[in-house]
Amino acid sequence: MGDWSFLGRLLENAQEHSTVIGKVWLTVLFIFRILVLGAAAEDVWGDEQSDFTCNTQQPGCENVCYDRAFPISHIRFWALQIIFVSTPTLIYLGHVLHIVRMEEKKKEREEEEQLKRESPSPKEPPQDNPSSRDDRGRVRMAGALLRTYVFNIIFKTLFEVGFIAGQYFLYGFELKPLYRCDRWPCPNTVDCFISRPTEKTIFIIFMLAVACASLLLNMLEIYHLGWKKLKQGVTSRLGPDASEAPLGTADPPPLPPSSRPPAVAIGFPPYYAHTAAPLGQARAVGYPGAPPPAADFKLLALTEARGKGQSAKLYNGHHHLLMTEQNWANQAAERQPPALKAYPAASTPAAPSPVGSSSPPLAHEAEAGAAPLLLDGSGSSLEGSALAGTPEEEEQAVTTAAQMHQPPLPLGDPGRASKASRASSGRARPEDLAI
C-alpha cells in the first residue's frame, strides 16, 4: 500500500499535546497497526484473489464467488479503520496548531508595538497567555481545546466499535478453507478454496485484539479526564479554604461573650419613722436622698409581709394605740402645774401608759413584721390609702385599744377632758402647745 510516513508525522505532532493514555494509544496505533499492516499483512493477502479457486468452468462464476466471500479486502478494511480512527486525532491536532499560530501572531503584534514606542524596554520579555500555556511551555488543555480532545476520544471509540462490528458481520473472526457458493451465473452450488486460511485467521485475530486494546485505552482516557476534571472542580471549591487554613494550626480562640450591663436592682425608697418624739418637737418627714434630720430617726428595712390583710389589720390597731397614748400624754401635759410647764418640752417624759397596754403593741409589731411607714400624729393620706382596712376591722381595732387602755379617773374638770379628747383626734392646735 501507500506510504504511511506522512500520517505518522502528523500523529507524532499530536502526541506532544495528548495525555499519557493518549500517547499510549498512539504508540499502539503506530506499532501494532500501521507497521504490522505495512510489513506483513500485505504479503499475506497479496495473492488472495489469484489463489481463490472454484471447481467450475463457468466463466465469471469464480469472480462472483470471490466478491461474495470478500466484499472488501481485509487489508483495505484495516486501512480504512486506521484512517477513520486517526481522523479525530488529526482534527484535535489542527485545533492545537491553530492556537499555536494565534499565539505567534500575538507575539508578533506585541513586538511590532514595542518597536513603535518611543522608549522601548528591550529587557521586558513577551508575556504569554497563562490560559493557553502551562509551566512546560505546552498548550494547556482547557476550555475549547479540552472539549475538542474529549470529542476526539468519543469519536475514536465509536469508530472502533463500528469497525469491529462491521468486521464480524462481513467476515466473522475465522476463515474456513472451504467456501460454498451458489450465486448466479454458477450452474449449481460450487466449492471454492481459500489460500492460507490459518495464517489469515491469525492476522484477523491479531488485528481484532489491537482494536479491542485501542477501545479499552479510549475508555480509560475518558475515565481519566472525567476523574481529573472532577477532582479539579472539588479542589477549586475547597482549595482557597485549605490554603488559608494550613494543617496543624489550632482553631481560633472563641470570641469572649458579650458583656452585659450589670443588673440594676430597683428597690423601694427607704422610709423613716420617728421614735416617739415629744409633743413640742416638729415632726420631719423623710424622703429618698434627703439628709437625715437632727432628731433621732430609725431606718427600717422594707420587708415583705406574710399576709397583706393581716399586716394591714395589725398595723391599723397599732396606729390607733399610738394615737390613744398620745391623747393621754396631751391630757397629762394640760394637767401639769405651771411650775413644771416652764421646763423645755424636750425634758417632758414619755406619756404614761398602763403596763398592760405597752406590751401588746410591741408583741404585735414583732409578730406581724409589717412594712414600716412614716408615722405622725395626724396620720397621712399615704398611710390611709396603703393600709386602710374595712370598717369592721377599724372598729375592732378601736375597741381593742379601748379595752387595753383604761383611762384614769379625771381629777379636774370633765369638760376639759372631753374637750382635750376631741382635740387629740385631729391635728394639734396652737392652744394645746401654749405654756
Curated annotation (Swiss-Prot):
Entry protein name: Gap junction alpha-3 protein
Keyword line: Cataract, Cell junction, Cell membrane, Disease variant, Disulfide bond, Gap junction, Membrane, Transmembrane, Transmembrane helix
Pathology noted in the entry: Cataract 14, multiple types: An opacification of the crystalline lens of the eye that frequently results in visual impairment or blindness. Opacities vary in morphology, are often confined to a portion of the lens, and may be static or progressive. CTRCT14 includes zonular pulverulent cataract, among others. Zonular or lamellar cataracts are opacities, broad or narrow, usually consisting of powdery white dots affecting only certain layers or zones between the cortex and nucleus of an otherwise clear lens.
Family: Belongs to the connexin family. Alpha-type (group II) subfamily.
Extracellular side: 41-71, 174-201
Taxonomy of the source species: Eukaryota, Metazoa, Chordata, Craniata, Vertebrata
Impact when changing V44M: In CTRCT14; nuclear cataract
GO biological process: cell-cell signaling; gap junction-mediated intercellular transport; visual perception
Ranges of compositional bias, category Basic and acidic residues: 108-121
Organism expressing this protein natively: Homo sapiens
